[in-house]
Swiss-Prot record:
Its main location: secreted. Residues 31-61 are annotated as: 4 X 8 AA approximate tandem repeats of T-S-A-S-A-T-T-T. It is found in: Secreted. The lineage of its organism: Eukaryota, Metazoa, Ecdysozoa, Arthropoda, Hexapoda. Residues 67-92, 133-146 have a biased composition (Basic residues). This is Protein new-glue 3. The gene is ng3. Residues 24-66, 116-132 have a biased composition (Low complexity). It comes from the Eukaryota. Pfam families: New_glue. Residues 93-106 have a biased composition (Basic and acidic residues).
Length: 146
């Protein structure tokens, strides 16, 4: 790779310097997809090196674009599945309202206990079903690829 880049650089420098010196009389320039090929009467070595770099560049692109081998792909999945936050309303009993109006700390602790117990019971079941769905989907896609 370095060798072809150096040759290409030398060829372009030579192309720029030849018209300045006025050494060549008939110079034709044709541009291809990857490099500039120059043919002149005085610089035949530049032409030869330039054509080799052009062919090398085209073979590299054609070999990379053709799909002869099946490469093994590794997929990285995110472990955490993001879900929208559910809003839970805590409904109080009339007996709780009478006590809690005077004491703030007791209501906070009750809210924490209720929200943590309800979220753990319902949250674990929903995450299990979600994970199994994802597992099935991954298994299907893995079967398709192989």
């Amino acid at each position: 790779m370095r060798y072809s880049c150096v040759l290409l650089l030398l060829a372009t420098v030579a192309c720029l310097l030849i018209p300045q010196t006025g050494g060549s009389t008939a110079t034709t320039t044709s541009t291809s997809a990857s490099a500039t090929t120059t043919t002149s009467a005085s610089a035949t070595t530049t032409t030869a090196s330039d054509t080799t770099t052009t062919t090398a560049a085209t073979t590299t692109t054609s070999s990379s674009s053709s799909k002869s081998k099946k490469k093994k792909r590794t997929y990285h999945y995110t472990r955490h599945v993001y879900r929208p936050k559910r809003i839970r309303h805590i409904y109080r009993h009339k007996a709780d309202d009478d006590e809690s109006s005077t004491d703030r700390t007791s209501t906070r602790s009750r809210r924490r206990r209720r929200s943590s117990s309800s979220s753990s019971s319902s949250g674990s079941t929903s995450s299990r079903s979600g994970n199994s769905r994802i597992r099935r989907r991954r298994a299907r896609s893995a079967r398709r690829l192989s």
